[in-house]
Amino acid sequence: MRVKTGVVRRRRHKKVLKLARGFYSGRRKHFRKAKEQLERSMYYAFRDRKQKKREFRSLWVVRINAACRMHNTSYSRFMHALKVANIELDRKVLADMAMNDMQAFKSVLESVKEHL
């Protein structure tokens, strides 16, 4: 009997099983289970790339708010004052300042103090 998909099937299986490394038990060793788990993992990866952006933004907000409250103001008032003072620093930079360079964050806070 002639096998028409011998090389092609081997390559396809090899590719799927290579991508399934690190999965648990049969999901790593058996082609069908590996393929199903791979589809699910690709779905998770796609979904979580979007979720990651939301999670980081909320983390930055929490950090900025904590730093603001140390200086007796709130996050919302601080962000409004930044907008009024026409200072265009994004939340990522502000959160990094709040965590690693408190002096710089304090100077930004002082510069918008009149707009609070």
Curated annotation (Swiss-Prot):
GO terms for cellular component: ribonucleoprotein complex; ribosome. Gene3D superfamilies: 6.10.160.10, Ribosomal protein L20 (1.10.1900.20). CDD domains: Ribosomal_L20 (cd07026). InterPro entries: Ribosomal_bL20 (IPR005813), RIBOSOMAL_L20_CS (IPR049946), Ribosomal_protein_bL20_C (IPR035566). Keywords: Ribonucleoprotein, Ribosomal protein, RNA-binding, rRNA-binding. GO terms for molecular function: rRNA binding; structural constituent of ribosome. GO terms for biological process: ribosomal large subunit assembly; translation. PANTHER family: 39S RIBOSOMAL PROTEIN L20. This is Large ribosomal subunit protein bL20.
